[in-house]
């Protein structure tokens, strides 16, 4: 299935309802929008709202991050995505885990919407609401947030 020249959706099985303009793709589903790829086994794509959503686990990948969750949605038009249940964002510099997270594949900003942990080699951040720029590693933490920074160890002088 193709939408314009930037969105391609593949799957082993496709059911399309012309009245509702909803495509249901099953097994080995791949949705590609420029540098963003969504992989799942069950995807519904609403052509009217330009929104794809999965509900049996999925993975969204861009140049910087890999996000997985039980349920999620992605809009190629707005580059916005929403993830729920067992959310994990893996970046070469850190891992963010959460129950609910929004993410923009264009500006690479994760919006924390529930209890979340961001863990890197020397830091552990807990927050229940805030913003985290995955490219600059700058955060704006709101509500209940805790930061633990480990001091790097230095060798003892001889």
Each predicted region: which residue ranges?
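A generic beta-sheet turn/junction motif
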Residues: 18-20, 33, 47-49, 62, ...
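Transmembrane beta-strand segments that form the barrel wall of outer-membrane beta-barrel proteins
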Residues: 1, 25-30, 54-60, 83-88, ...
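Solvent-exposed loop/turn segments connecting transmembrane beta-strands
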Residues: 4-6, 33-37, 62-66, 91-95, ...
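A generic tandem-repeat structural signature
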Residues: 7-10, 15, 19-39, 44, ...
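Single conserved hydrophobic/aromatic residue that forms the stacking wall/gate
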Residues: 147-158
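Extended lipid/amphipathic-ligand handling interfaces
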Residues: 1, 10-18, 39-47, 68-76, ...
């Amino acid at each position: 299935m193709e939408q314009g020249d930037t969105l391609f959706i593949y799957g082993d099985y496709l059911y399309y309802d012309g009245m509702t303009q909803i495509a249901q793709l099953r097994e080995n589903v791949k949705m590609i929008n420029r540098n963003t790829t969504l992989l799942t086994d069950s995807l519904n794509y609403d052509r009217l709202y330009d929104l794809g959503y999965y509900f049996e686990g999925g993975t969204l990948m861009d140049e910087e991050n890999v996000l997985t969750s039980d349920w999620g949605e992605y809009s190629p038009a707005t580059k916005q995505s929403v993830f729920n249940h067992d959310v994990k964002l893996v970046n070469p510099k850190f891992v963010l885990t959460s129950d609910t997270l929004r993410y923009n594949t264009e500006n690479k900003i994760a919006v924390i919407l529930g209890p979340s942990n961001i863990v890197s080699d020397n830091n552990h951040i807990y927050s229940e609401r805030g913003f985290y720029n995955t490219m600059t590693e700058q955060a704006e933490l709101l509500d209940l947030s805790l930061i633990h920074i480990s001091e790097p160890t230095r060798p003892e002088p001889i």
